[in-house]
UniProtKB/Swiss-Prot annotation:
Belongs to the RNA 3'-terminal cyclase family. Type 1 subfamily. One of its GO terms (biological process) is RNA processing. It is an enzyme of class 6 (ligase). Gene3D superfamilies: RNA 3'-terminal phosphate cyclase domain, RNA 3'-terminal phosphate cyclase, insert domain. It comes from the Archaea. ATP binds at residues 100, 291-294. The gene is rtcA. It comes from Hyperthermus butylicus (strain DSM 5456 / JCM 9403 / PLM1-5). The keyword Ligase applies. This is RNA 3'-terminal phosphate cyclase. HAMAP family: RTC.
Amino acid sequence: MIVIDGSIGEGGGQILRTTLALAALLGKPVRIVNIRAKRPRPGLQRQHLTSVKAVAELASARVEGLELGSTTLVFIPRGLRSGRFYFNIGTAGSITLVLQALLPVTAFAPGPVEVEIVGGTDVPWSPPIDYVRFVLRKLLAMFGFEFEIIVKRRGHYPRGGGRVVLRVTQPPHVLKPVKLEERGKVLRVEGLSHAVRLPRHVAERQARSAEAVLRSKLPGVPISIDLEWYEPSRDPHLGPGSGVVVWAVAEHSVLGSDSLGAKGKPAEAVGREAAEKLLEDLATGTALDRHASDMLIPYAALACGESILGGARLTMHAWTNIEVVKMLVPGAEMEFIEGGKLNEKFKLRVKGICYKPSS
């Protein structure tokens, strides 16, 4: 049994999610210790419990240590399954972080998969659901992995109540390598500004602010930010909550950024923050924003051939994913061909193992 130290790197939930996904696919029993050792509340929280339950269901896994606050987990996968599944985090815990653990597994499921998850769609310390819909989904399509994300209802901290459906109609069973080095010319910028259980002007001000910052730095580039808002009598959300996601469609890639509303935070600051983060990442010229560059590493390790990932910033999450891949997928070869220092832009060459479910 492989032992993974959950305190390495960022020492949070990322190690758990990547370990679960890779162990499920490769059929490797793992024991994860020191789970979330570097967090104020160590051990498994509700969102992590749901991640474990979800991957365990799809991998027919036997699990030990599945309880709130547990710092040790044993995960023994016994074969991938397809079908329809339902998971309720029970709080405003992040749906997108559960998806982060689940998505790689669904790419290799024996048949169609549909998963409904209840929790938070737009919550702190995790990618918003619109980032997954409009950025990550497009990047994973380049690996040959296509799926649908249906947002039935948004959920914000602290009440949650969001409902998202993941639908994988045709799991690819094999991933293509990608060359995502430079982004190329920025063709257009799109976005979505939402506000639920709040006045319409919140969504409008977020969008206007983001658009103004982007126009000042990207002259001549078409910019379009849509609004999502609901009449109070027809608003199905628990709310209140708001946020904006913006993404640049470039010749060779898509890069995204986001910002969440918060009590006391002006809507203008929300829009400005999202736009400035996107501009920072675009300024590097790389194909991937600071978030996507860590999320794609496990996929590249499983792909058939050599991928190159050019990231705007080497985050601790990316470094952590590299270390977990080294432990669980030793056949994957990884080397920095540019950069390699934290918080600097980088290019990573990944020679994947051409994983197939029967292998």
